[in-house]
């Protein structure tokens, strides 16, 4: 059956979504203005303003496995929302992986230690620190423990 019973009435999926979005909004302590929407469809909380401004609650982003054990990521903007720059969250867990960037990338460390190895040298960053990696760099992303960071790419379509 579609929906859930509440005091003898059926609640459809749209009503349930509105209730969930209202609860999430209250939990985040935000006031929505006319035209703003809260979306949770992508598995995390995103506030959209009609101007195109977005706010992503990074703590709600759940990364998905990517290419090898110990590497997970989640893009948090779509090409429709941000056609020029990409953004997402990446997590590394006691791992290293080799990558050649065909784009420019900023990495903003949220938790743990991120190490970028290039030509035998290591650039290390901790929470609150930012690393810039220029296009065409052949590197190893690595961490001695666990790290979670925001990546921002230009151009947006990094894959």
Describe each model-derived feature in a short phrase:
Residues 1-10:
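Short, Lys/Arg-enriched N-terminal segments with co-localized hydrophobic residues
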Residues 11-25:
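Eukaryotic intrinsically disordered, low-complexity regions enriched in proline/serine/threonine/glycine
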Residues 21-86:
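A short, N-terminal "cap"/entry segment at the start of jelly-roll beta-barrel domains
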Residues 71-101, 135, 157-158:
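Conserved short histidine dyad/triad with adjacent acidic residue
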Residues 91-92, 100-116:
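Short, conserved beta-strand element in jelly-roll/cupin
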Residues 135-158:
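Ligand-binding loop in jelly-roll beta-barrel domains
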